[in-house]
Amino acid sequence: MTTSSEQPRTGYKRVMLKLGGEMFGGGKVGVDPDVVDNVARQIAEVAKTGAEIAVVIGGGNFFRGAELQQRGMDRARSDYMGMLGTVMNCLALQDFLGQHGVECRVQTAINMAQVAEPYLPLRAERHLEKGRVVIFGAGMGMPYFSTDTTAAQRALEIGCDVLLMAKAVDGVYSDDPRTNPDAELFTEITPKEVIEKGLKVADATAFSLCMDNKMPILVFNLLTEGNIARAISGERIGTLVES
């Protein structure tokens, strides 16, 4: 475990950026245009430098399948509602990226040809090579799989160098920093140490996919201006989870 080290990090060429849907809503139901515009601007600035950026967005600002299930809804049906929510977020981000001069394609795991391409990994890779941002919507297209898991699976299939987990905190802590002021921020940690310490990085399925396939995970604070660029360039921000 490393909590403070000056060992340099390398930058990344192709990245998967996982964004929580709650952030798009600014704490409310729906899409906050100012928030989405800010995220789009940061992504556009980095994309114009030659970085290849794929994005997965949650749908928590519209629906959360697990929460709807607790209120008596069928889990599969409520998960599909959540998937549709992610597509609305994808289209919003696509529009704002276009306003910032970046070409973008949305690919969805559920066929909806009038608004997006179907998920085709080889086509997604070609888009990235041509400098387009690719946003993956509708989760895995199947219930019981989170958007964290989608981000991990897509990152592996299209050959990303790292999974960037954008959060509202600075990284992975030894305890909840909101309730424990003495909580320690890890700058580097191994997957084994994450498990031993019971730390929360991503959901269990997503974390296992990354650990088994040696995909690094970088957890960082999206609310700090310029952090997407810093994360991709290799600056020492957030927490790097790597074997």
From Swiss-Prot:
Binding site for ATP: 18-21, 60, 64, 173, 176
One GO MF term attached to the UniProt entry: UMP kinase activity
The keyword Flavoprotein is assigned to this record: no
The keyword 4Fe-4S is assigned to this record: no
Major location (coarse): cytoplasm
SUPFAM superfamilies: Carbamate kinase-like
EC number from the UniProt entry: 2.7.4.22
Disulfide linkage: none
Pathway: Pyrimidine metabolism; CTP biosynthesis via de novo pathway; UDP from UMP (UMPK route): step 1/1
Description of how the protein assembles with itself and partners: Homohexamer.
NCBIfam families recorded: pyrH_bact (TIGR02075)
Its biological purpose: Catalyzes the reversible phosphorylation of UMP to UDP.
Protein name according to UniProt: Uridylate kinase
Organism: Corynebacterium glutamicum (strain ATCC 13032 / DSM 20300 / JCM 1318 / BCRC 11384 / CCUG 27702 / LMG 3730 / NBRC 12168 / NCIMB 10025 / NRRL B-2784 / 534)
